[in-house]
Amino acid sequence: MEKISLKYVAGVMLLLKSSLIGFLVWKIVTSPNELQSLHFDKEFLLFVGAGFLAQIIDGALGMAYGVSCSTMLLGIGVPPAIASASVHTAEVFTTGVSGLSHIVMRNIDKRLFFRLVFTGIIGAIIGAYLISKILDGKIVKPYIAAYLLLLGIYILIKSFRTINDKKSNWKHAPLLGFIGAFFDSIGGGGWGPIVTSNLIDKGNSPKEVIGTVNTAEFFVTFFSTGVFIFFIGVDAWKTVLALIIGGVIAAPIGAYLIRFLSPKTIMRLVGVLIITTSTYTIYKSLH
């Protein structure tokens, strides 16, 4: 695997991304009823806002787009499967740009990339299938909210920890990739907080970890999106479009804010946001 050039990885990414764009364009063109159903109403603006806030967080922190966006969508009332499908479809575009940028800047460790990507794809496919076909959305919603709540607490605790110097270690990277992708597909987020934070905590270079994990995330989100499209379609393309619009607007702002806020401060803000919103979602689900 180490003999495979990153240029080929970038080429595959561009091919897959182009195929998804082509499919979405074809779907919209051949479904005029869906196109006519688009209304720039309050709901649409709420989705734009969710995408906007999530992208600002991700741009400043380098993770937590999915978990932040999914938490807000669940809080708004979007069903778990639709929320996860929408977030992952939008993420194909954001992670694609991010991954290609890291390849150009050579922020990637190829050995770590191939240890993550294959098990990550398998975990993403299994998780997406379960939330699409097996698990009942109404029943599983409070459990997903509880998972996001724990993830928020995890992020908050991480923000107060000092990372000690350790020898670089990615021995359990394949298992970590599977677990991160599996819960990411089911919960709509968690790949970054689970995979990135654990690899950095084990002493790996933050620069290479973020670049490698973000690039692998493109393939995770692409294949989970494929499963979602196959089983539940793209009826939620209104949500997807709103998330993309919000993310595009927020992208330069998030990159700008990173100059003024430390990563630990952002992690604390993200943790509090996720804990608060998830708690509210659980409360609504039980009453």
Task: Indicate where each model-derived feature is located.
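Small-residue-rich packing faces within the transmembrane alpha-helices of Major Facilitator Superfamily
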Residues: 92-95, 149-152, 218-222, 275-278
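Residue positions within transmembrane alpha-helices of multi-pass solute transporters
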Residues: 64-65, 96, 122, 126, ...
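Juxtamembrane transmembrane-helix termini in multi-pass membrane transport proteins
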Residues: 61-109
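A small-residue-rich subset of transmembrane alpha-helices
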Residues: 95, 213-229, 238-251
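Transmembrane helix-bundle signature of multi-pass membrane transporters/permeases
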Residues: 84-92, 210-218, 248, 274
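Conserved active-site and cofactor/substrate-binding residues in soluble primary-metabolism enzymes
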Residues: 68, 91, 144, 194, ...
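Juxtamembrane transmembrane-helix boundary motif
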Residues: 1-53, 59, 72-76, 104-186, ...
